[in-house]
Amino acid sequence: MEVTTRLTWNDENHLRKLLGNVSLSLLYKSSVHGGSIEDMVERCSRQGCTITMAYIDYNMIVAFMLGNYINLHESSTEPNDSLWFSLQKKNDTTEIETLLLNTAPKIIDEQLVCRLSKTDIFIICRDNKIYLDKMITRNLKLRFYGHRQYLECEVFRVEGIKDNLDDIKRIIKAREHRNRLLADIRDYRPYADLVSEIRILLVGPVGSGKSSFFNSVKSIFHGHVTGQAVVGSDITSITERYRIYSVKDGKNGKSLPFMLCDTMGLDGAEGAGLCMDDIPHILKGCMPDRYQFNSRKPITPEHSTFITSPSLKDRIHCVAYVLDINSIDNLYSKMLAKVKQVHKEVLNCGIAYVALLTKVDDCSEVLQDNFLNMSRSMTSQSRVMNVHKMLGIPISNILMVGNYASDLELDPMKDILILSALRQMLRAADDFLEDLPLEETGAIERALQPCI
């Protein structure tokens, strides 16, 4: 008779998002294999990485993950890392909380016991009961502590990861840092409330990843990969209209305090790509959303939707030069000249700027262990220095990301780079706002000089 798990497809999918691309194989099911702890351990020992799940009710699962179920009849004094998590269904959503501990289970009096500092924190008891200490329930945000009956206990072998939890621990810590970055950006407010939303201009060569960066930011805040902005190729620009994209916090959430402005790509050929005479109008806020670009003719004040008196909120507050990290060393002279021409206009307007190096192959290698800074390899370091020399951008404002292009699922490492870059852009924009002359900051509602 085939033994089937109580774990739903939806719950298993949430675990894959938590742990990465893994598969689960059922080793033990208490209602089929019996409730003896010794039998469970014997069946699950020497199986590599495992997850032990206790189904508290139909809406709550408590589980722990081990790098290996050691032979618990043998004495062992070595501590063992374990990952604890809870899955709780609330209002048609599944919430997951995690906790990393340095403890290993042992059989004591026919019970499976985990101790921390000589205190029992978790026990799988006889008669389908478990015990959870307050420390566990508080960290996992459970609504109970102490003894509780469970419906079923199952143990799975986790395939697709190593037999230690180092990779998983890094993923969990990455998710925690990612969530802190999300919270920082959600709580962000532009300097002195001079504007309600920061406008960030994405400009760079054709195919460098401008539209993909917007899609990536939106994907993170929506919780799944999206593709609102159509993405072009490395040869021809598909962005033909100026777009001012807002980003909502979730599908039906409120708009976040920034906008990403997407442009036609720069092209080294004459009469192709973004018209260079459009740049000042974009920077000063004269170009309307959905304006149809013309590579050979810039927008003029005679255009029906030209914004003749842009206010501070209409202007660009930070420019991101989007460059393919793999092509920086091979930028041909005409393309480099156009990038420098854009940069000259940005400097003339006094606008903040950063460089965004896209198409990073391995985001996990770029991040330092604490996720706070980027660990640059010799190759990436040389390209960063090349951009620094070309445009004079401070090294701290040269950022690396890997956009969501062909991915189907979100990656916490990739999210951290994207969110860190976005946060740095917002900080740069704050510097720009703080440095504005008093005649502008003192009368924000007053229209600025006509952009002609």
Swiss-Prot record:
Mitochondrion in keyword set: no
Function: Type I interferon-stimulated gene (ISG) that plays a critical role in antiviral and antibacterial activity. During bacterial infection, promotes macrophage differentiation and facilitates inflammatory cytokine secretion. Plays a role in the control of respiratory syncytial virus/RSV infection, reducing the ability of the virus to replicate. Exhibits a low antiviral activity against hepatitis C virus. Also acts as a feedback regulator of IFN responses by negatively regulating IKBKB and IKBKE kinase activities through interaction with FKBP5.
Key words of the record: Antiviral defense, Cytoplasm
Domain called TLDc: residue spans: 1-159
Entry keyword annotation includes Cytoplasm: yes
Compartment(s) of residence: Cytoplasm
InterPro entries in alphabetical order: P-loop_NTPase, TLDc_dom
PROSITE patterns: TLDC
GO (cellular component) term, any one: cytosol
Full protein name: Interferon-induced protein 44-like
GO biological process, one term: defense response to virus
Induction summary: By type I interferons. By M.tuberculosis infection.
Family listed: Belongs to the IFI44 family.
Oligomer and partners: Interacts with FKBP5; this interaction modulates IKBKB and IKBKE kinase activities.
Taxon lineage: Eukaryota, Metazoa, Chordata, Craniata, Vertebrata
Ranges in coiled-coil conformation: none
